Amino acid sequence: MSKEKFERTKPHVNVGTIGHVDHGKTTLTAAITTVLSKHFGGAARAFDQIDNAPEEKARGITINTSHVEYDTATRHYAHVDCPGHADYVKNMITGAAQMDGAILVVAATDGPMPQTREHILLGRQVGVPYIIVFLNKCDMVDDEELLELVEMEVRELLSQYDFPGDDTPIVRGSALQALNGVAEWEEKILELASHLDNYIPEPERAIDQPFLLPIEDVFSISGRGTVVTGRVERGIIRTGEEVEIVGIKETTKTTVTGVEMFRKLLDEGRAGENIGALLRGTKREEIERGQVLAKPGSITPHTDFESEVYVLSKEEGGRHTPFFKGYRPQFYFRTTDVTGTIELPEGVEMVMPGDNIKMTVSLIHPIAMDQGLRFAIREGGRTVGAGVVAKIIK
C-alpha cells in the first residue's frame, strides 16, 4: 500500500496501554507503531525506544512515560505507555495523560493478575471511558478452551467494575510475533486498530463543551464594573450571554457585557484563551478566586466526594511520615485551596508516602466540580498528593 500523507485534519484520539507487569504492554506498543507505519505511514518505534521512558513532572510528581504516535486510515492517535506499575497509578490519577480509551493487555498464558484488576479499577475511578482488550501471547497457547476461559475471566472482571464486559472487543494476538513481521499476527494488530477506530467514539473537543472559566483574579474598573480574568477551560463565551458564578458561596447569575484579551475588546473568548470578562452589576467583593464562571446549569458546587489519591513519596518532595484519619490538609482545585477532612477505607489506619488510596473527602466550602476533576493535596503550599474526583456524594 502506498503511504498516506499525514493529515493534520484527522481527528486526534488519546489512548494508552494498561495491564499487569510483563504481560507485554510495551511490546504491543512497539508492534502497533511498526505494523501501522507499514500500512498508514508514520514512524515505527523500537521496543527499547519505548521502554526507556523519559521522566516527566506532572503536578510536581515524577512519572516515567513514553509517548508514541500512530495513524489509522481515519484517525491520528497519541498513545502513552509506562514502564512501571507506580508510573501507571500516578499517570492515571494526575491525568498527566488523559485517555479517551485504554488497551488492556492480558497475557493468555497467565490470565488476569492483581495489577490487571487494579488498572481496571483505576480506569473506573479516574474515568477512562472505554477499554479494549488485547489477549497477548496467544501463539504460546494451543488450547482453544483455555483461551475461552481467560476471555471469560477478563469479561467478568470488566463487568465487576461497571465496564460492559460482554460487549468489550477482545483481540487474540501476539505482540512479539507481530513485531517480528509474522503476517497472521500482524493481521491482529490491524484488527486492534479497527476496534480503536470503531469502539472508541471521537472525543468531544474542549471548544464544543459547555463554557467554563476558573476565576484567577477579580478587578474593579471604575466606570465599567467588575472584571474577572482566567483561562477559558472549555467552551466559548460571547458578549451578552448569561453565566453562573459557581463555588464557595451561593450560586449567582450575571451577564457578560464584555470580553477582552490583551486589552482589546472581542466578541467572544474561546477554550484555551486567557481573557477578562466584564460582569454586569456584580460587585468586586461578591466574587473571589477559586469560583468559576460557567454556562448556567452546566456545573454544580459540592463539598463531599469519593476520590482516588496518590500520596507523594519523600523523594518526590512529599511527606516523610504517614498520615492518619483526622488528617486535614488543603485540597487545591483549579485556582484555590480549600481545607477538607478525610475518611479512609474500612480497615485502613494510616497512609504512607508513595501509596495510592481511595478516600472520602469533605470540604469546608463547596467547589464547582464534576466527576474526573483533578486536584492536588497541599500542606502550607507544598504539594503532598494528587487526586481525582471519582464520585460526588453531596
UniProtKB/Swiss-Prot annotation:
- G3: annotated segments: 81-84
| Top-level taxonomic group | Bacteria
Q: Which reaction does it catalyse?
A: GTP + H2O = GDP + phosphate + H(+)
The listed locations are:
Cytoplasm
Looking up InterPro entries in the UniProt record yields:
EF-Tu_GTP-bd, EF-Tu_GTPase, EFTu-like_2, EFTU_2, G_TR_CS, P-loop_NTPase, Small_GTP-bd, T_Tr_GTP-bd_dom
EC id: 3.6.5.3
Q: What UniProt keywords apply to this chain's record, in alphabetical order?
A: Cytoplasm, Elongation factor, GTP-binding, Hydrolase, Magnesium, Metal-binding, Nucleotide-binding, Protein biosynthesis
User: Might you report a single GO cellular component term?
Assistant: cytosol
Q: Where is this region: G1?
A: 19-26
Record keyword Signal present = no
User: Per the database record, which ranges form the tr-type G domain?
Assistant: 10-204
Tell me the residue numbers annotated for binding GTP: 19-26, 81-85, 136-139
Q: Which SUPFAM superfamilies match?
A: EF-Tu/eEF-1alpha/eIF2-gamma C-terminal domain, P-loop containing nucleoside triphosphate hydrolases, Translation proteins
Q: Which GO terms describe its molecular function?
A: GTP binding; GTPase activity; guanosine tetraphosphate binding; translation elongation factor activity
Residues binding Mg(2+) are: 26
Q: Which family does it belong to?
A: Belongs to the TRAFAC class translation factor GTPase superfamily. Classic translation factor GTPase family. EF-Tu/EF-1A subfamily.
Function in brief: GTP hydrolase that promotes the GTP-dependent binding of aminoacyl-tRNA to the A-site of ribosomes during protein biosynthesis.
User: What name has this protein been given in UniProt?
Assistant: Elongation factor Tu
